[in-house]
Amino acid sequence: MTEQKGRYLFTSESVTEGHPDKMADQISDAVLDAILALDPRARVACETLLTTGLVVVTGEITTHAYVDIPNLVRDVVRDIGYTRAKYGFDGSTCGVMTAIDPQSPDIAQGVDVAIEVRGEVNEKELEIGAGDQGMMFGFACDETPELMPLPISLAHRLARRLAQVRKNGTLPYLRPDGKTQVTIEYEDGRPKRIDTIVISAQHDPDTTQEQIRKDVIDYVILDVVDRNLIDDRTRYFINPTGRFVVGGPQGDTGLTGRKIIVDTYGGYARHGGGAFSGKDPTKVDRSGAYAARWVAKNIVAAGLARKCEVQVAYAIGVAHPVSILVTTFGTGKLPDERLAQLVRETFDLRPGAIIRDLDLRRPIYRQVAAYGHFGRPDLDLPWERTDKVDLLREKAGI
């Protein structure tokens, strides 16, 4: 597999924190954080549904901690910005229902101690088994300083800016829901220019589309985007339907785990299918994907490749990965097989070791439930560290 040649377009999207699916992710991760703050070894799989006037929180949670979930939900909804009935949703008056069960004992017996050491007392904390089967992907490339693909990086920055100008009063007529999309023109695998930007921003009913278009270009797009990437052929579609008043959970039902491509690489890399939010780190859907990003980013930061995708796969109840694959699309300084060997020598990808090395039993998850889990220079995220660069270069002999 090599880099694509010639000229082509690639598009990624993001959504604001007020999008109903992202509201669900933030609520699920807020519940997770609140529990981990009191019980770091809790087992949490928290799912959220939002619709007009109602939030439903369900899932499997095993913990000795008590968390007031209804009040927590209301705090999250109000913090996002749904504070008035005229927005179609109000955190102070919406209904909140909870339906929580404990984790299945059949799953727990495989996670508590992996099959490799079941019946033994040997490095027990490191030898917890994977919480499920599955494959996860991590990716990094040199298109941005944070080693992320440019389309998703810009889409996230635009979405965050859209929320910022709403919250700080720069554009007071904006409401919480919104989406962004960026199309980049590439040539021989390198980004050259922005072809198209799409922004849909929920707004008050008495604001004209002309005003919204002008303000979004001036205060959102031009504040975020490198003007060297814009030319006279760049197209802007601002609220292209002509009106976006009804939004949030009133406009669409929100569900945890419905924005997995927004959460990762914007479709630029492959995805194993597992969502992140609401899951404690024994769930390899989350910790495995974070570790794969950590590995891929260190390979690129070490100068061993310009693009790197890492696949890791697990069996439920088994600690060691069943497979590790490194793909560098023809940009690697070493063969992909050799890089995979370096990964096995340098990184311990057992779930317990990932949890230890990345210190994942902490309440750090709600902050990444909107605007991306990866490539966040605004946050100090352990899976974004490039702490294995020197060791990788030494082992690679460069």
UniProtKB/Swiss-Prot annotation:
Stretch list, region Flexible loop: 103-113
UniProt superkingdom: Bacteria
Enzymatic reactions: L-methionine + ATP + H2O = S-adenosyl-L-methionine + phosphate + diphosphate
Pathway participation: Amino-acid biosynthesis; S-adenosyl-L-methionine biosynthesis; S-adenosyl-L-methionine from L-methionine: step 1/1
Enzyme Commission number, as recorded: 2.5.1.6
Gene Ontology MF: a single term: ATP binding
Entry-linked PROSITE patterns: ADOMET_SYNTHASE_1, ADOMET_SYNTHASE_2
GO cellular component, one term: cytoplasm
Cell compartment(s), UniProt: Cytoplasm
Cofactors that this protein relies on: Mg(2+); K(+)
Residues at which K(+) binds: E47
Residues engaged in binding ATP: H19, D177, G178, K179, R243, F244, D252, R258, K259, A275, K279
Keyword Protease attached: no
GO terms, biological process: one-carbon metabolic process; S-adenosylmethionine biosynthetic process
Cofactor descriptive note: Binds 2 divalent ions per subunit.
Listed Gene3D superfamilies: 3.30.300.10
UniProt keyword list: ATP-binding, Cytoplasm, Magnesium, Metal-binding, Nucleotide-binding, One-carbon metabolism, Potassium, Transferase
Keyword Cytoplasm in record: yes
Pfam families for this protein: S-AdoMet_synt_C, S-AdoMet_synt_M, S-AdoMet_synt_N
Family: Belongs to the AdoMet synthase family.
Stated role: Catalyzes the formation of S-adenosylmethionine (AdoMet) from methionine and ATP. The overall synthetic reaction is composed of two sequential steps, AdoMet formation and the subsequent tripolyphosphate hydrolysis which occurs prior to release of AdoMet from the enzyme.
Protein name: S-adenosylmethionine synthase
Biological source species: Symbiobacterium thermophilum (strain DSM 24528 / JCM 14929 / IAM 14863 / T)
